[in-house]
Design a protein with these regions (language model features):
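Active-site/acyl-donor-binding loops of N-acyltransferases
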Residues: 2-19, 23-25, 29, 97, ...
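A conserved beta-strand-loop-helix scaffold within acyl/acetyltransferase catalytic domains
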Residues: 26-112, 152-182, 186-310
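A short, internal acetyl-CoA/4′-phosphopantetheine-binding micro-motif in the GNAT/acyltransferase core
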Residues: 117-131, 302-310
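Conserved acetyl-CoA-binding loop-helix of GNAT-fold acetyltransferases
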Residues: 129-140, 310-322
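Hydrophobic pocket-lining residues that define ligand/cofactor binding sites across diverse proteins
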Residues: 140, 267, 325
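Conserved GNAT acetyl-CoA-binding A-motif
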Residues: 145-153, 325-337
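Hydrophobic, well-ordered secondary-structure elements that form the walls
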Residues: 282, 314, 321, 325, ...
Length: 385
C-alpha cells in the first residue's frame, strides 16, 4: 500500500470517536460522512446483532468504499439513521439514488450505497431486533425513486425481510430472485476429520503435493501485517496479476484496488486480516487474502506464479488456510460468490444470495412490474429451449 497510513483522503474523517446523538429521536437522513462519524462501535454492534454478521455491512467496509467510489456517488449517498428515544442508534440504511437500466429501460433506482464495488456478499439492513422498520419505510417513501433494488442479500436476511413486510403493508410490491452461489465449509474441530470428508483421490493429492514441496524446497508460509503490510499487499497483487497474465483479475479496476487497500489497513489494525504467501526457497510462489469476522473466515482473493502450476502451490496454500481456520476454532469458511471449479473441490455446500426489487403502487409501478414479468417469462422460455 505504498506507505499509506490507516486512513487518508475521505477516510481520514472516519475517526473512532462517535458523534453525540443523545438529542436525536426518530429517523434522520445523514450524509455518509456524518453517518461514518458515528464511529465503528455504533455500526458494528448492529452488524453483530443482525444474524450471521457480514463484514460488508461494517463501518470498515463503508469507510473504505467512501474513500474509493466516485466522488459524486459518495456525495449523493444518504444514510437513514433511526434514533431511539434515548438517542441510541437503532437502525442504519445506507442508500444511493442512481440511474440504472432496469430490463433495458432507464429508471431512477434506489440501491445499496456501496453497490457492487468490490463484490460484497451477504448484505442486510442494519437494525436491532426490537426496532420496527415502518419508520424507515416512511423515510424511503419521501425519496424520489421508481424501483428499490437490494442486491447481494444474505439468504434469509432477517431485517431485509422485515423491511419488505413493512413495504408490502403500504401496498408496495416485492419481487425476489436468486443471485449468487457462495460455497462454504462448516468447519469441525479436527483437520484430519475434515480430510476424511473428501474423496480419497483428493486427500492423496493434497498430501502428495505438500510432501513434495517440503521435500524439494525450503517451504514456508509468511503472514503480513504491521510494518510488512505494504510488502504483503504488493506481493498479492503481483502474483494475482501473474495468474491472469496481466489480462484481468479482481484488481484491474483502480476503485476496487483502492477500496481493498483501505479495507486491508483497517482489518490489520483489528487483527482480522489474513494476508499470506507460500514461499519456496525464499521467494513467494502463491498468495492468499482473506479476513475473519465473528466465527467465519472469508476467502477473498489469491494469486500464484504460473511457473509453479505443476506443483499446485495454490492448492497447498488453500489447504493450509482451511487447516488454520479449523485449528483456530472458527466455525465456517466462506469462499464468497462464484462456483469456480477449485471451490467445488473443497465443498458441496453453498448459500444463494438474493436480489429483492420493490415497486411503488400506481401506474408507473404496474408498468415496471409488467416489464419485469415479461423479462422473467422470456428467460424461462430461453432456459427450456
Amino acid at each position: 500500500m505504498d506507505g499509506l497510513p490507516l486512513a487518508t483522503g475521505f477516510a481520514a474523517g472516519c475517526s473512532e470517536e462517535h458523534t453525540d446523538t443523545t438529542s436525536r429521536v426518530g429517523v434522520v437522513r445523514m450524509s455518509v460522512s456524518d453517518a461514518l462519524a458515528l464511529g465503528p462501535a455504533v455500526w458494528d454492534v448492529l452488524v453483530a446483532r443482525d444474524g450471521p454478521p457480514s463484514p460488508f455491512m461494517s463501518w470498515a467496509w463503508h469507510c473504505a468504499w467512501a474513500d474509493s467510489a466516485p466522488v459524486a456517488e459518495v456525495a449523493a449517498t444518504k444514510v437513514l439513521v433511526h434514533f431511539g428515544t434515548n438517542g441510541t442508534v437503532q437502525a442504519l440504511l445506507p442508500v444511493l439514488r442512481r440511474r440504472i437500466a432496469f430490463r433495458r429501460v432507464p429508471v431512477t433506482a434506489l440501491t445499496w450505497a456501496i453497490g457492487d464495488l468490490g463484490c460484497p456478499d451477504h448484505l442486510d439492513a442494519l437494525a436491532t431486533p426490537e426496532t420496527g422498520l415502518d419508520v424507515l419505510v416512511s423515510a424511503l417513501a419521501e425519496l424520489p425513486w421508481e424501483v428499490f433494488v437490494l442486491s447481494n442479500l444474505a439468504p434469509n436476511a432477517v431485517n431485509a425481510g422485515r423491511l419488505c413486510d413493512a413495504m408490502a403493508g403500504r401496498g408496495w410490491v416485492v419481487r425476489r430472485r436468486p443471485l449468487w452461489a457462495c460455497p462454504y465449509l462448516e468447519l469441525g474441530d479436527d483437520w484430519d476429520r475434515y480430510l476424511a470428508t473428501l474423496t480419497s483421490t483428493r486427500r492423496q493429492t493434497l498430501r502428495r503435493k505438500e510432501r513434495n514441496l517440503r521435500r524439494d524446497h525450503a517451504m514456508a508460509i509468511t503472514d503480513y501485517d504491521g510494518d510488512r503490510l505494504d510488502e504483503g499487499w504488493n506481493r498479492l497483487v503481483a502474483l494475482h496479476e501473474r495468474r491472469w497474465d496481466g489480462g484481468g483479475g479482481a484488481f484491474r479496476d483502480p476503485s476496487v484496488m483502492r477500496l481493498h487497500r483501505r479495507f486491508v489497513a483497517e482489518l490489520a489494525a483489528r487483527r482480522q486480516l489474513w494476508l499470506s504467501t507460500l514461499d519456496l526457497d525464499g521467494a513467494p510462489a502463491a498468495a492468499w487474502y482473506g479476513f475473519t469476522w465473528g466465527d467465519t473466515v472469508y476467502f477473498y482473493q489469491s494469486g500464484r506464479d504460473p511457473r509453479w502450476d505443476r506443483e499446485s502451490v495454490g492448492l497447498v496454500l488453500m489447504a493450509a488456510m482451511i487447516r488454520r481456520a479449523i485449528e483456530g476454532g472458527y466455525r465456517r469458511f466462506d469462499f464468497l460468490r462464484g462456483e469456480d471449479v477449485y471451490k467445488r473441490d473443497w465443498t458441496e455446500s453453498r448459500r444463494i444470495t438474493e436480489e429483492i426489487t420493490i415497486f411503488r403502487p400506481g401506474w408507473g409501478g404496474r408498468w415496471l412490474r409488467a416489464l419485469d414479468a415479461v423479462a422473467e417469462l422470456r428467460g424461462r422460455l430461453r432456459g427450456r429451449a
